[in-house]
């Protein structure tokens, strides 16, 4: 499946707009990881635990987006937008929301 942030795909013709698709993932933050991340931030290191959680959440979101697009008969998603939100009590959770337009396209 082709997935792109652009509104069109070079070399392809959009035959049908299937609809808006969304993939979301909400990940809880572990208290111990939060403590170690804060220590790393103080000493200037990168927080690998948070980076791993972001990557995992993004991958889940893209899988959901693709599954929804396929269920509509699409073979591509255009205009993809990725949003990140900190949610939950005290910002204890991370939400990744990915949206786009499912389309059916063919070669030019």
From Swiss-Prot:
Gene3D superfamilies: Hypothetical protein apc22750. Chain B (3.30.110.70). Coiled coil: none annotated. InterPro entries: UPF0145_dom_sf, UPF0145_YbjQ-like. It holds the Pfam family YbjQ_1. It comes from the Bacteria. SUPFAM superfamilies: YbjQ-like. Belongs to the UPF0145 family. This is UPF0145 protein Patl_2194.
């Amino acid at each position: 499946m082709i997935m792109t942030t652009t509104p069109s795909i070079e070399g392809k013709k959009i035959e049908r707009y299937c609809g808006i698709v969304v993939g979301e993932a909400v990940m809880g933050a572990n208290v111990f990881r939060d403590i170690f991340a804060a220590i790393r931030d103080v000493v200037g290191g990168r927080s690998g635990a948070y980076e791993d959680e972001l990557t995992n959440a993004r991958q889940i979101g893209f899988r959901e987006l693709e599954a929804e697009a396929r269920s509509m008969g699409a073979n591509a998603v255009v205009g993809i937008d990725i949003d990140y939100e900190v949610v939950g009590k005290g910002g204890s959770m991370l939400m990744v929301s990915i949206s786009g337009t499912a389309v059916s396209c063919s070669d030019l």
